[in-house]
């Protein structure tokens, strides 16, 4: 057995305690051992989360028989009043309203581009020119009515284009065919 002097042990102990005092311990992450563990199994999903009252679960998107369209597609079809408010919003933001229509597929599909992501390969046809001078939602809704009259069995969407950043900022379906 090797003998170690008590002076060497004291030096090691002093260095260890001095080093521990120089650096504050990291307290950002906590050990999971500090969390309470529930021993009983609870199959009632409403008790998992709480907003101060009883949580009611709601199905957000039906998994069968409903195609995904654009922004707001999870809502029922927008009324004329709701469409006017959306158009007023995009005009207020300084975006240029534009109408586009699609005769066959108004939902997400990949035909011209196969990689995942925002771009899904759809090309819509522009209805007339963008409404550069539009100051009121009624002007856009009149164009929407004209497009509906010309192509009643088409998908029609309203987009808001930011000509400074050169990006499309908003897009939503304003009209769907009767069979959708």
Swiss-Prot record:
It is found in: Plastid, Chloroplast. Residues 1-56 form a transit peptide. One of its GO terms (cellular component) is chloroplast. GO terms for molecular function: ribulose-bisphosphate carboxylase activity. GO terms for biological process: photorespiration; reductive pentose-phosphate cycle. The keyword RNA-binding does not apply. Belongs to the RuBisCO small chain family. The basic functional RuBisCO is composed of a large chain homodimer in a 'head-to-tail' conformation. In form I RuBisCO this homodimer is arranged in a barrel-like tetramer with the small subunits forming a tetrameric 'cap' on each end of the 'barrel'. This is Ribulose bisphosphate carboxylase small subunit, chloroplastic. It comes from Medicago sativa.
């Amino acid at each position: 057995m090797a003998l170690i002097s008590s002076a060497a042990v004291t030096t090691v102990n002093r260095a260890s305690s001095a080093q521990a005092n120089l650096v504050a311990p990291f307290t950002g992450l906590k050990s999971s051992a500090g969390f309470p563990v529930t021993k009983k199994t609870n199959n009632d999903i409403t008790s998992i989360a709480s907003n101060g009252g009883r949580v009611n679960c709601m199905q957000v998107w039906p998994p069968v028989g409903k195609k995904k369209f654009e922004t707001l597609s999870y809502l029922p079809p927008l009324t004329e009043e709701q469409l006017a408010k959306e158009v007023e919003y995009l005009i207020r933001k300084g975006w240029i309203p534009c109408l586009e229509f699609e005769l066959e597929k108004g939902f997400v599909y990949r035909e011209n581009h196969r990689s995942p992501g925002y771009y899904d390969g759809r090309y819509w046809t522009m209805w007339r020119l963008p409404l550069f001078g539009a100051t009121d939602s009624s002007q856009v809704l009149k164009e929407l009515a004209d497009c509906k009259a010309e192509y009643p069995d088409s998908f029609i969407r309203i987009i808001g284009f930011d000509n400074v950043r050169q990006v499309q900022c908003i897009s939503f379906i304003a009209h769907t065919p009767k069979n959708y």
